[in-house]
Amino acid sequence: MDILVLDLETTVERIEGRIDNSPKNPRNKCVSGYWGWLGDDTVDHVKKAVWYHKDYNGCDPTDELRADLLSADMMLCHNTKFDAEWLLEMGFTLPPLVFDTMIVEYLLAKGQRRPLSLKESAIRRKVKSLKKSELIDDMFREGIDFSEMPLDVVNEYAEADVKACGELYLAQLPILEREHNQSLKKVIPFMHEMLLFLCEIEMNGVKVDLDVLEEVEHQFQAEKDILEKRLNEIVESVMGDRPINLNSGADMTRVIYSRELISREAHQQTFNIGTNEAGKSLRPPYMSSSQFIDAVRVTTRIVHKTTAIQCPDCSGKGSTQKFKVKTQIKRGKKYRVQTDEPYKNRTKCKTCVGIGAIYQSTGVAAGLRMSPSSPYDASINGFKTDKETIKGLILQAERKKNDVAVEFLTKISRLNALSTYLDSFVAGIQRGTRNSGFLHANFNQCVASTGRLSSGGGMSINLQNQPKRGFPVRKCFISRFENGTWIESDYSGLEFRTACELSRDSQGLADILEGKDIHRQTASIVEQKPADQVTKDERQRAKAQTFLPLFGGTGNGQPAHIKAYFDKFYGIYEGIHGWHQSLMTGTLKNGTVETPSGRQYFWPNVERTKNGRVTRATQILNYPVQGFSADLVQLACIRAFRLFKQANLRSKLTLTVHDSICVDTHPDEIEQVKSILTEAMTGVGEEAEERFGYKLVVPLDIEISGGPNWLEQQEYA
């Protein structure tokens, strides 16, 4: 096999503190290219072409690189997607196969966090041609890109990278041949095929209607303003005159839990708050309920309502006026005497610290009087007020019939969501949409430990974190074709089906074959109403509860009817419960879990805890389901890409989000696209058997919908 090792150097643009090195930015340029044929132990000769550099007059021809790419059997890079997209944008044709040494390093990490740069990977594999260049790193930090660096430094650096990449590949081959790594050889080919699919959708991009996005922004902002006004009214009623910042963790602890820290240091020590040398969060200590209550009382104190009175020292102005002094001599002695001439600037009042008021305690307990449930709720500012914690606190407030707390917590949860929507999605899409009107997402194969795709980085936004249905921002994603249709095909209940598949749960399989709506069943229990009265929104909300038992959730701390759901789930789906026990026992023995697709996860220091579970239990039970689900979705993407090329369609594959594939569909190709997506996604079982030697027993079902944009969708029959 003729393997061409390649590395491209490009310019980058820094926009609002973000690095944009996308080939879709018309201001970015490919500075130079370096490539060579892989020999027995390295790349013996590295060729180069310079196309855009301040010290280089002219532009080298591309003929030799074009010919080498056409004659190569495989192109080898580190972070191949980046180089591949630049080559495609420049009009080159890729070889039949691509290979990414970063993907292999990611797979060899087996779910553990480790640096994946070429430099770190080469050090790890003891590559001889690695050239560490502090000069290059320093110039990057100073905002100097490759077109402005000394050309001889760039050439030396890039040529060494080409050789290091080739040698890294050669070092990886024998590691993959080791017995305990054999299964990874099944994953590697389809991850590289998936890489080409990602190149396709990223280069295609999605058409954005910025006017619609602006309307959504105004709607979000108007709702946010109303929420903030009402939340501040509630705060004033439960806290008195004390000023509260809704974005402050310490202030939210005061409002929600009615407590504040006595000593931050003592609080951190008591609840083991912080990180270890590896940067991982420390594990909270085990405490009985009474011990936890005592610890809360020792490290925090009750907050009282306050009344504001005018500061007597500054008359409520928050500052005092000082006057200049002059020196006088009287009877031979010097005296400093205040004059009537004031200083230009007033001085902050020390008594009220510039506020203009002094807050006096009324002796009445303030806040919503919620209770933290365990040491896991402790945080550096007092107690947690994150999204998941607030969900639990809402249930607690409902049990206590604390209507004010329910309203506040529900509204603060929505306010936080709106802030995320405005900052991450609306602003992110506005920033990332090119002058062409297209947003080009960036998908990452080597970030999520599970094997799931992530998105983001550079000018891209995290599409994986958006709400799945009914999210108004989706309305701005439209078709590039006149009268075109945005089609989305989504796997139905994939994670539940995957859990039933991996556990071979007989009841789960029977429910799937009978078409039982698991999420509706869950919603019926959670909402405490008959299944036929469950609304679509209630069913969607209940999905989170359905998935929790799949990943080892116990329902502890939940209301009795929800806790009963967890117990009932494990009683009904005994196969899943037994599989969970098997996973934990197996991980205790050898530290590794493997999926049918060959993906592996490694936990080296797992141990059994006092309550009978094992450490890392959530990951041990979650990763196999997430990983195999991800691999099934990626196989579907590969199949869709293959079928699209065969059909030579004008329609464009645009996104894969969660368990779905999105297509910007030409008006003349709707039926073809629906047919291709159905074949690609429901036929994944055949592909899995061919690639992995594994036969699926659980059928996969999809829902296909279409409409003028990503929000307004009608399900096809």
Give short role names for the model-derived ranges.
Residues 1-18, 25-27, 32-35, 44, ...:
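Conserved "right-hand" nucleotidyltransferase catalytic core of DNA-directed polymerases
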Residues 25-28, 35, 39-178, 275, ...:
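Active-site-proximal helix-loop-helix substrate-binding element of RNase H-like nuclease domains
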Residues 77-78, 98-102, 479-494, 557-561:
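Conserved catalytic palm subdomain of right-hand nucleotidyl-transferase polymerases, strongest
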Residues 81-92, 105-109, 253-261, 492-507, ...:
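Short active-site loop/helix that positions an aromatic residue
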Residues 107-111, 200-224, 499, 556-562, ...:
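Catalytic palm subdomain of template-directed nucleic-acid polymerases
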Residues 196-199, 203, 306-349, 357-358, ...:
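Conserved catalytic core of nucleic-acid polymerases
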Residues 442-530:
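Function-dense linear segments that define catalytic or interfacial modules
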Residues 678-690:
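A common structural junction motif
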